[in-house]
């Protein structure tokens, strides 16, 4: 992913947070993956291996795209809360974010 698209994705995620279309935190995100509400999931690239494995396994099982693109500091900056895991629950935001990530 190029730097321009990375910044656009970060801005879009911040907008989704302000629009109330994000679920944050490991347990809530995993619950939304299970309930098939989460459309795309992000886990901090500096999260613990256990956290990464748990989120990725759940995402894989329920066929929810999961990305490890941002650090915890970047996630905190984007959403305004110190979190390592979050998911987008809106189809529109999820689709556009995935397009930006995949170039």
Swiss-Prot record:
Keywords: RNA-binding
Annotated SUPFAM superfamilies: L30e-like
Record-linked InterPro entries: Ribosomal_eL30-like_sf, Ribosomal_eL8/eL30/eS12/Gad45
Pfam families, alphabetized: Ribosomal_L7Ae
Segments passing through the bilayer: none
Top-level taxon in the UniProt lineage: Bacteria
GO molecular function, one term: RNA binding
Record's function text: RNA-binding protein that recognizes the K-turn motif present in ribosomal RNA, but also in box C/D and box C'/D' sRNAs.
Family from the record: Belongs to the eukaryotic ribosomal protein eL8 family.
Record-given protein name: RNA-binding protein YlxQ
Organism: Enterococcus faecium (Streptococcus faecium)
